[in-house]
Amino acid sequence: MTDKPEINDEVEKLISSIEEKNRLEAERKANKLLSKNKRELNRLYKHAQIAAENNNFAQYEYAIKKSRDILKQPYNDELISILWKTTRSQIEDMIDAYTRKIQAS
């Protein structure tokens, strides 16, 4: 009966050490991926910004899909569409706020 708590403690320690090793390995791989692709990701980020400002969905879609491929993040057409709509909405809100500010002056 006294062996069960000791076994449970050992199992918990083993599981936590494995989880910690996995976390460190995942962090190392993520840092390596980001450092390797830093310039390309920055280029794609700027490309997406310019495309959104110019109301060019095709270029925006290209930049988002390519960056998500590099980062190994899943995406689908619905997600890209939602990102586009929210981005365009934010840009339009900024333009409207600036226009109201100028008209109030």
UniProtKB/Swiss-Prot annotation:
Pfam families per the UniProt record, alphabetical: DUF2654
Q: What is this protein called?
A: Uncharacterized 12.4 kDa protein in mobB-Gp55 intergenic region
Organism, per UniProt?
Answer: Enterobacteria phage T4
Its lineage opens with: Viruses, Duplodnaviria, Heunggongvirae, Uroviricota, Caudoviricetes
- The primary gene name is y03H
